[in-house]
């Protein structure tokens, strides 16, 4: 069993104003899924992108929107969860005055 605090995990800068912490992955003994903590600073846009795998999101703190090529498609606030299907173009924008934080789960075998 693994029990840690997120502050014990180093942050990786994804782009300016956005960091990612790999909380659980293969090196922690998880064979199937990775759990990541994403933090987006106020006013920052996570550039639209896509992946060949699904991912699941659960919003912890802050406010923002999920975007796709057509514009804003959903509000992000604590308690909201999002399923992003494989290869769907998506991005995020922090619309609040506090960091937007969410858990993002992805499969390790992709």
Language-model segments: residues:
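A short hydrophobic beta-strand segment most commonly corresponding to one strand
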Residues: 37, 56, 83, 98-110
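A short, N-terminal "cap"/entry segment at the start of jelly-roll beta-barrel domains
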Residues: 1-32
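Short strand-connecting beta-turns/loops that link adjacent beta-strands
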Residues: 28-29, 71, 97-98, 110
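A generic "binding-loop/recognition-motif" signal
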Residues: 52-53, 72, 88-89, 98
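Short acidic-glycine-tyrosine-enriched beta hairpin
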Residues: 70-86
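Short beta-strand His + acidic residue motifs that chelate non-heme Fe in jelly-roll/DSBH
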Residues: 47-48, 66-67, 84, 89-96
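Short, conserved beta-strand element in jelly-roll/cupin
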Residues: 37-40, 51-66
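Conserved short histidine dyad/triad with adjacent acidic residue
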Residues: 21, 36-51, 86
